[in-house]
Amino acid sequence: MREFDSTINLTTEGKLSLFFVGCGSAFSKADFQTNLFIIKNDSHILVDCGTLCPFALEKRFNTGISAVKNLLLTHPHADHIGGVEELALNSLYVKKSPLNIVITDEFKKSLWKNSLQGGLKYSENGKLGFDDYFVQIKPTKILNKPFEIFQTNIGDINIKLFRTFHVTTKINSLKKSQYSVGLIIDDKILYTSDMQFKPEVLNWILQNYDIQTIFHDCDVAGYAEGVHASYKQLCTLPAEIKSKMFLCHYNSASKKINPTNDGFAGFAQGGIYYDFD
């Protein structure tokens, strides 16, 4: 792990790096929201851009939003997409070039219709659409069961997007649930984004990929088990899984516990480069 210096370095010399802009829950102000950069060689991806992300980038990390070239959104809650309108307008009017976005056709349609068009559809030059602001990088579906997995590459970064259970209107039905995905990065890093406690999903991924490190959603207080994995639930996982698991998306209740005492790798921290060979 490396400490943040003066600005976020969006290049590496061969290593894969994850840099969390924030690690907090949707309502966290002190820890910001759980948004992060994936960085390798000359390529980077900003994973999610919540309401606080542009502020955190500029005020905490001295990094302007114009530095962002590639974006991936895991689901349409405000702590994950609330800053996207600012990114889009900056790309159109300041950078004058559209922003690359990794997104399926399904999510592209619903994201524009239900979340973005209210602030982005109308301009002084007439009506605009999704493709006026973004260049879609469409991932390829590589698996249907036990859950959908999509894959793409951004430069030297391989990304697999797997469907997750986050907000489910019908238990165990992804078709009747809000779109949400987690990520497998270079076949060795697992990032769940927001996800319910689903040990069967974890076990399947761990059996099929050589996962070195896990960054897992964690509701420390435990009041949102219907949509987030709770700390209590995660504590029931086998020791070999917990030992490589960092917890993120936590709230202020995290100040009262030390997860290493329960066998976890710890809480993920904002402003730290997590480096992997």
For the regions a language model picked out, list residue spans one by one.
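Core dinuclear metal-dependent hydrolase active-site scaffold
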Residues: 1-60, 138-200, 270-277
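Structured loop/turn residues at beta-strand edges in well-structured enzyme cores
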Residues: 13, 63-66, 155-157, 209, ...
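Residues at the starts of beta-strands that form the adenosine-phosphate
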Residues: 17, 43, 98-100, 212, ...
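Active-site flanking residues adjacent to catalytic metal/cofactor-binding acidic residues
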Residues: 47, 74, 191-193, 216, ...
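Active-site metal-binding motif and surrounding structural segment of the metallo-beta-lactamase
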Residues: 51-103, 210-214
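Acidic/polar short surface loop at catalytic or gating sites that assists cofactor/ion binding
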Residues: 98-143
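Cap/insert and terminal regions of metallo-dependent hydrolase folds
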Residues: 195-277
